[in-house]
Amino acid sequence: MQTRIDLVADLGEGYGDWRMGDDDALLGIVSSANVACGFHAGDPTIMDATAAACAERGIQLGAHPSFPDRVGFGRRDMGLSAAEVRNDLLYQLGALSAFAVAHGTRVRHVAPHGRLGNLVGVRADYAVAVADALCAFDDSLIVVAQDGELADEARRRGLPLAI
């Protein structure tokens, strides 16, 4: 049995000239990246540059969607309906996917960020909404989740899962 470790980091978390972390340093050591999709952090220019850098280095690109909460960095409960969660996820996946395709790669996984990432573990309606979005968008995407409702829903639907 061969063991493989996938080192992943959250990247593209900035706005305009402001950057959250040292993405260039992380790009030198990671094999996968969770890329902010514009709702908690990231903007079109940052998403484009991050997708390009990942494609150039052969780093697997993943979506890091969140609640539409820039001020709270995606860490606040927004009181969204399940339909809003589904639609927000589809919107963010589409945005990152466009940049990935522009650089000859594709989105490979999705890892919900912040409060969304916490709530999909305990709220079945949010877990179903995320799974619905993934099935509608690309059911080959690996779901990165904590053990809980989203992981259970991914298993029920036969979606690829990493915990």
Each language-model region and where it sits:
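Active-site rim beta-loop-alpha module in soluble metabolic enzymes
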Residues: 148-163
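Charged helix-capping and loop-helix junction motifs
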Residues: 123-129
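Hydrophobic faces of well-ordered beta-strands that scaffold small-molecule active sites
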Residues: 5-9, 33-35, 61-65, 108-112, ...
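Acidic (Asp/Glu)-rich catalytic clusters
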Residues: 24-28, 49-62, 101-104
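Catalytic beta/alpha-barrel core
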Residues: 35-40, 119-120, 137-148
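A short alpha/beta connector and helix-capping loop motif
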Residues: 15-48
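N-terminal basic/disordered segments at the start of proteins
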Residues: 5-19
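Glycine/small-residue-rich loop that forms an oxyanion/phosphate-binding "nest" at active or ligand-binding sites
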Residues: 70-112
